[in-house]
Amino acid sequence: MTFNLSEQQEKKYLQQVIGIINDTIQNTDTSVKEHVETLQEYKDYIWSNKDIDPHEIRSMRESILNHFALGESVIDKRRRLGKILDIPYFGRIDFEEKKNGSSVLPIYIGIHTFYDSQSKTNLIYDWRAPISGMFYDYELGKAVYTSPTGEISGDISLKRQYRIRKGKMEYMIESSLTVHDEILQKELSSNADDKMKNIV
């Protein structure tokens, strides 16, 4: 069974992903604020206690540097989240690994990886990740990518491209080929919609 079979289901899923990204952004903003407040407390303490002994200064310096480094990484994460909020992903492949008991894995591909800590899954894979390379290198059918544990082979059963702007899906194309031209993408999408309307 295909995950998010229709365009309507895909649009609903997109809004769910954006909701999770927004929640993560709020948590990240809270974390940034906490780091800033902690650094301000250190600064105030140093200014109000001019006669601190050198040993205490050394340990405080270490804590300040750690907080600063953590704060920088949180700010970097916030910047990445801001980038993926408007356009979370642009492509998808459904891949089933060739081994017993494996199921079809929908792989959404975007400019950055997004890991959902609640469900403990990657909702979006970075386009440079080895698994994402199959989107560019293969059509439907047999496919292979190299993971840290070795070569993984299987089958691609679905390939889609999306046009998402400001968190809204403008259209999607289901195709065995990767179409890069934007005008052609839009035309293919509207033709596919017309065909579906005629069938229904």
Regions found by a protein language model. Give the residues of each.
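Extended, charged low-complexity regulatory segments
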Residues: 1-198
